């Protein structure tokens, strides 16, 4: 058997010296990663709950269900209003498209109340803006 060759460390050419770069917070890893914000209707749902039933609370699961409900209704109304605008060859969704979409999506008496409350809210907003 042949004798084993001695292992020698590989010789390296000296590396070029570069000016030391400033270490930033992200390079050192000390900066905390900011939590991504999740937009919900929770605060608004809570305010309405306190207006109607001041002594009643709401669980996190119930709040999640209510948030899903509001998102669902919003998407339905926005989708229907978008279709109505497209049918009329308009590129803008106005209050009229929203009102018609509400009448189409919500049943009977609920639609009437929603339209009257919506009209009241738009009037209040318009008078405050002027």
Swiss-Prot record:
<feature type="modified residue" description="Phosphoserine">
    <location>
        <position position="11"/>
    </location>
</feature>
<dbReference type="GO" id="GO:0003677">
    <property type="term" value="F:DNA binding"/>
</dbReference>
<dbReference type="InterPro" id="IPR055333">
    <property type="entry name" value="HISTONE_H2B_site"/>
</dbReference>
<feature type="modified residue" description="N6-acetyllysine; alternate">
    <location>
        <position position="17"/>
    </location>
</feature>
<dbReference type="InterPro" id="IPR009072">
    <property type="entry name" value="Histone-fold"/>
</dbReference>
<dbReference type="GO" id="GO:0000786">
    <property type="term" value="C:nucleosome"/>
</dbReference>
<feature type="cross-link" description="Glycyl lysine isopeptide (Lys-Gly) (interchain with G-Cter in SUMO); alternate">
    <location>
        <position position="17"/>
    </location>
</feature>
<feature type="modified residue" description="N6-acetyllysine; alternate">
    <location>
        <position position="8"/>
    </location>
</feature>
<feature type="compositionally biased region" description="Basic and acidic residues">
    <location>
        <begin position="1"/>
        <end position="19"/>
    </location>
</feature>
<keyword id="KW-0238">DNA-binding</keyword>
<comment type="subunit">
    <text>The nucleosome is a histone octamer containing two molecules each of H2A, H2B, H3 and H4 assembled in one H3-H4 heterotetramer and two H2A-H2B heterodimers. The octamer wraps approximately 147 bp of DNA.</text>
</comment>
<keyword id="KW-0539">Nucleus</keyword>
<dbReference type="GO" id="GO:0046982">
    <property type="term" value="F:protein heterodimerization activity"/>
</dbReference>
<feature type="modified residue" description="N6-acetyllysine">
    <location>
        <position position="12"/>
    </location>
</feature>
<feature type="modified residue" description="N6-acetyllysine; alternate">
    <location>
        <position position="7"/>
    </location>
</feature>
<feature type="cross-link" description="Glycyl lysine isopeptide (Lys-Gly) (interchain with G-Cter in SUMO); alternate">
    <location>
        <position position="8"/>
    </location>
</feature>
<keyword id="KW-0007">Acetylation</keyword>
<dbReference type="GO" id="GO:0005634">
    <property type="term" value="C:nucleus"/>
</dbReference>
<dbReference type="GO" id="GO:0030527">
    <property type="term" value="F:structural constituent of chromatin"/>
</dbReference>
<dbReference type="InterPro" id="IPR000558">
    <property type="entry name" value="Histone_H2B"/>
</dbReference>
<keyword id="KW-0832">Ubl conjugation</keyword>
<keyword id="KW-0544">Nucleosome core</keyword>
<feature type="cross-link" description="Glycyl lysine isopeptide (Lys-Gly) (interchain with G-Cter in SUMO); alternate">
    <location>
        <position position="7"/>
    </location>
</feature>
<protein>
    <recommendedName>
        <fullName>Histone H2B.1</fullName>
    </recommendedName>
</protein>
<feature type="cross-link" description="Glycyl lysine isopeptide (Lys-Gly) (interchain with G-Cter in SUMO)">
    <location>
        <position position="18"/>
    </location>
</feature>
<keyword id="KW-0158">Chromosome</keyword>
<dbReference type="Pfam" id="PF00125">
    <property type="entry name" value="Histone"/>
</dbReference>
<feature type="cross-link" description="Glycyl lysine isopeptide (Lys-Gly) (interchain with G-Cter in ubiquitin)">
    <location>
        <position position="124"/>
    </location>
</feature>
<keyword id="KW-1017">Isopeptide bond</keyword>
<comment type="similarity">
    <text>Belongs to the histone H2B family.</text>
</comment>
<dbReference type="InterPro" id="IPR007125">
    <property type="entry name" value="Histone_H2A/H2B/H3"/>
</dbReference>
<feature type="region of interest" description="Disordered">
    <location>
        <begin position="1"/>
        <end position="39"/>
    </location>
</feature>
<keyword id="KW-0597">Phosphoprotein</keyword>
<comment type="function">
    <text>Core component of nucleosome. Nucleosomes wrap and compact DNA into chromatin, limiting DNA accessibility to the cellular machineries which require DNA as a template. Histones thereby play a central role in transcription regulation, DNA repair, DNA replication and chromosomal stability. DNA accessibility is regulated via a complex set of post-translational modifications of histones, also called histone code, and nucleosome remodeling.</text>
</comment>
